């Protein structure tokens, strides 16, 4: 990295393919696979329906950097399930393959720095918003390049827009205790219809659901 367009391989059914590359520019990257012929972000085939979860992250750290055991990676995806026998595409948003209320709850100590790598592997924009705190965007990149080496790109935010195929490295400090959310701020992405289970209406809720 940085890379050029079209650095992909085609794997036929039943084939295996082994590849290697030099870890170049430090940053947050991901790999993906699709059987689709639809064109999506950066002119690449668009993952759709059953292949929307075929991706993974890889992080290139600067030479000599010690591993950070507290660092977390979050991959945003959209599961387009049109396997049902109707003409509707059923879209569910997810982080690391899970949709609320099944997403992982993270617990941190007050005053300790938190470091996240966030990857938008979906085909839609996601303005990612953190409740209660500002966070520092240390880099903002895409599948070809990352701005991790440029200090001029570092800035504070409460919401950072990630276009399809974009990534960011962020850090923040939980200065006050509480239960805080990190979510996409696109309204219809946080509607109950986007979740993997039926969310009860307010008048149907039991106190233990809150």
Segments predicted by a language model, with ranges:
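Copper-binding active sites and cupredoxin-like electron-transfer domains
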Residues: 1-210
